[in-house]
């Protein structure tokens, strides 16, 4: 039996989906927004791609099919929460445009945020050295190096984290979401 999400919402929740390369700043911005919304008394949950992969998608690899399955699992949980009035922040690479479009089309009140930084910047930010290993061919299926990252063509918000601070990004997020001070 396959469960699908419908756009009908019983609550006033929404899903803010942060997508971008590893190291672009998705988790940083999502966490900053999470803290701000909690401080304002909103019901909010943060679904981090790494945590979901560890807990709900353990055993999945990094093939396109496995990545798509992981994204669909995240979207399923996000949709359930949002339908009950929760603002859900999703921080996940979600590398394939078609899969992102599919899941966003079935989520209540979705906002796609493209967290963008050039490869040179994310490589410099990478304290584990994963990009350098991937560029040297030591890590197969690495998004942005040996596997594609398909940038959103028309995201709701495009944040260039190599050009703005976390505080500026947070302000743009709050303005876009209509959650002004």
Curated annotation (Swiss-Prot):
Pfam families listed in its UniProt record: APS_kinase
Keywords: ATP-binding, Kinase, Nucleotide-binding, Phosphoprotein, Transferase
Enzyme class: transferase
Residue positions of the active site: 94 (phosphoserine intermediate)
Entry's EC annotation: 2.7.1.25
SUPFAM superfamilies for this protein: P-loop containing nucleoside triphosphate hydrolases
Family per similarity comment: Belongs to the APS kinase family.
Designated name of the protein: Adenylyl-sulfate kinase
Organism, scientific name: Deinococcus deserti (strain DSM 17065 / CIP 109153 / LMG 22923 / VCD115)
Gene: cysC
């Amino acid at each position: 039996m396959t469960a699908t999400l419908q756009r009908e919402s019983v609550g006033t929740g929404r899903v803010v989906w942060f997508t971008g390369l590893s190291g672009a700043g998705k988790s940083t911005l999502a966490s900053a927004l999470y803290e701000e919304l909690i401080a304002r008394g909103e019901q909010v949950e943060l679904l981090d791609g790494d945590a979901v992969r560890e807990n709900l998608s353990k055993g999945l690899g990094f093939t396109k099919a496995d990545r798509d399955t992981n994204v669909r699992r995240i979207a399923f949980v996000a949709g359930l929460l949002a339908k009950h009035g929760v603002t859900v922040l999703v921080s996940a690479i979600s590398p394939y445009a078609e899969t992102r479009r599919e899941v966003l089309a079935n989520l209540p009140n979705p906002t796609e945020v493209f967290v963008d930084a050039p490869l040179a910047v994310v490589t410099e930010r990478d304290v584990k050295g994963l990009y350098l290993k991937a560029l040297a061919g030591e890590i197969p299926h690495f998004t942005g190096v040996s596997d594609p990252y398909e940038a959103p063509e028309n995201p709701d918000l495009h944040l260039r984290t190599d050009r703005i601070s976390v505080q500026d990004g947070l302000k743009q997020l709050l303005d876009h979401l209509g959650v002004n001070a």
